[in-house]
């Protein structure tokens, strides 16, 4: 399986006061269903146990991070390995947070880092649905997600990013935030999306950037049925019908001006740009409820933690 290396932006001060954490999880298909078969951890990142609200074939896992946010000097690394035929649904109990960064660099680096990597073997299935990420005013965040899969894997996943707390008069103006999302299929890069926000580049306000919106999000869907495969010779018709269903759902939710859908190398890319994280999440859930039966042959069963 491909292993990728993320190059962090340069450190401007000698690292001090760091809190490094990593969590590596392995999920395997066993005679009793998908099981968490290996765990390696250091620091505050953890999981308790797998939940099975829809039966043994799909494990629901909640990532726990007791500090509830990332501060300057923190570096969190998360690695998820989904073995052949295993099925994982991965989520978090609450919002992730990049807090205001330290300004005094004599006590340590200002940057806050989270690096996540999913490795999917053949016929593996992974659904990655974290709660929203809140980036506070004055943050200095770097957040990356790499997905490595095969042409027979299935991946459904989203990320929802909220800039500042505008309802509390904490507008995101001076902060810095870089987000990098990549997807590799059979070691070939098919999707690369990067946004780097800083006071100097005006992407927050620019019409070709966020155009003043405070919430941006992406929903990715990849499955054999969506790309060229001899077993799916009627792919163009299926794909067209699926896109039409998604557009109809977006229209029914009156979200045409906030949501776009594109197809890149068999990967469906659905984007939201607006001001309301909850609106975005509910819309993405409705799209998941549409996509899951078609791509995974399973009805959508929401994680219990979403209702607490």
Curated annotation (Swiss-Prot):
One of its GO terms (molecular function) is nickel cation binding. GO terms for cellular component: cytoplasm. Keywords: Chaperone, Cytoplasm, Nickel insertion. Signal peptide: none annotated. It is found in: Cytoplasm. Pfam families: UreD. It comes from the Bacteria. PANTHER family: UREASE ACCESSORY PROTEIN D (PTHR33643:SF1). Required for maturation of urease via the functional incorporation of the urease nickel metallocenter. Belongs to the UreD family. UreD, UreF and UreG form a complex that acts as a GTP-hydrolysis-dependent molecular chaperone, activating the urease apoprotein by helping to assemble the nickel containing metallocenter of UreC. The UreE protein probably delivers the nickel. This is Urease accessory protein UreD.
């Amino acid at each position: 399986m491909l292993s990728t290396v993320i190059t962090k932006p340069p450190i401007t001060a000698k690292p001090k006061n760091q809190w490094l954490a990593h969590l590596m999880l392995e999920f395997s298909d066993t005679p009793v269903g998908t099981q968490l078969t290996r765990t390696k951890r250091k620091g505050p990142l953890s999981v308790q146990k797998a939940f099975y609200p829809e039966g043994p074939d799909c494990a629901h896992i909640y990532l726990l991070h007791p500090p509830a946010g990332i501060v300057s000097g923190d570096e969190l690394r998360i690695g998820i390995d989904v073995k052949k035929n295993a099925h994982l649904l991965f989520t978090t109990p609450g919002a992730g947070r990049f807090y205001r960064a330290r300004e005094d660099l004599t006590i340590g680096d200002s940057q806050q880092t989270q690096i996540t990597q999913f490795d999917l073997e053949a016929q593996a299935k992974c659904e990655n649905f974290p709660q929203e990420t809140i980036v506070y005013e004055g943050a200095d965040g770097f957040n990356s997600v790499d997905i490595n899969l095969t042409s027979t894997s299935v991946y459904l996943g989203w990320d929802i990013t909220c800039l500042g707390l505008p309802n509390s008069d904490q507008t995101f103006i001076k902060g810095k935030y870089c987000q990098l999302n990549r997807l590799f299929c059979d070691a070939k890069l098919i999707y690369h999306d990067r946004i780097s926000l800083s006071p100097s580049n005006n992407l927050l306000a620019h019409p070709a950037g966020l155009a003043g919106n405070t919430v941006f999000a992406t929903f990715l869907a990849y499955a054999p049925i969506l790309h060229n495969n001899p077993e799916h010779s009627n792919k163009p018709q299926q794909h067209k019908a699926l896109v039409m269903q998604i557009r109809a759902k977006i229209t029914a939710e009156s979200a045409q001006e906030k949501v776009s859908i594109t197809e890149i190398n068999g990967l469906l890319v659905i984007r939201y740009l607006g001001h309301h994280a909850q609106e975005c999440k509910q819309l993405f859930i409705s799209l998941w409820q549409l996509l899951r039966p078609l791509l995974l042959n399973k009805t959508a069963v929401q994680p219990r933690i979403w209702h607490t």
